[in-house]
Amino acid sequence: MAQHDKSPIEPSDRPMGERIVGAAPAGAQGEAAAAEAVRDMFTSIAPRYDLLNHVLSMNIDRVWWNRTARVFSEVLHRPGAQVLDLCCGTGDMTFALHRRLTIPTSAKAALVGGPMNGAPTQIFGADFSHAMLVRAEQKSVGRNIRWVEADALNLPFPSGQFQLVTSAFGFRNLANYDRGLAEIYRVLAPQGEMGILDFGEPKGLIGKLYRVYFRRVLPAIGTLISGVRGPYAYLPASVLRFPSPDEMLQRMRAAGFHEVTWTPYTFGIAGLYRGKK
């Protein structure tokens, strides 16, 4: 597995000084206000969220979701596995995990179909935006996925329930990153695995081109299509505020995770954090 790059982000691009607690939308004072502002933003763009994601990422987001689901294929195929996709939004990562269940991990599994000698895997998608979950449910007809409206910092699940917890482009929006990691750790079963897929900032020429697109072009297109400016001005700011890979790995270790790694995707534009309980 690829290990994290020691310098994936230009130091001058990161906020300096105090330790970052969590997301901080403009004007939000405190964690409760930050969480409410994030919920309001995603509610405002829910109707066109999927279209914008695919257009603005030039469909690379689909590659990232599928690659992440493939990484966790073995866990997904464990008999009776319980899987949680946290901050699931309209469900794209959730659906990628579900699709992976149809791909056997071995010839023997292909013959018997699905998880061997045990109950089927159950996938949950959780988000605190009602509007986003409504969209996810509309897209999930015919799929055995349970949707739960829940706050990632106070999950309604018992400790040790899940063999896998994922989050794609949602963890960055939490009002408190350490509390978010603590909740993931709590709901994971012993030896359970976690994966956080989120944006980074690449280096070199690719990084310079990416920053122009991400900070100038993307907000303009997002605002034009959605008719709402706030979320697409917030997006690049939230990526800048998010901890660097080195710091995220330190936070994961502090939360109790071991075997922590960061694997860059597409020149470091995005990357996958992994850890085990």
Q: PLM ranges: what are they?
A:
Residues 256-277:
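Core SAM-dependent methyltransferase catalytic element
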Residues 58-81, 96, 100:
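Conserved alpha-helix/loop element of class I SAM-dependent methyltransferases that forms part
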Residues 153-165:
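A short acidic, Gly/Pro-enriched loop at the edge of an enzyme's catalytic core
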Residues 82-154:
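Class I SAM-dependent methyltransferase SAM/SAH-binding core
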Residues 49, 165-166:
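Hydrophobic beta-strand segment of the Class I
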Residues 178-193:
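A short glycine-rich, Lys/Arg-flanked "PGG" loop and its adjoining helix->strand segment in the class I
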Residues 193-222:
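Conserved class I S-adenosyl-L-methionine
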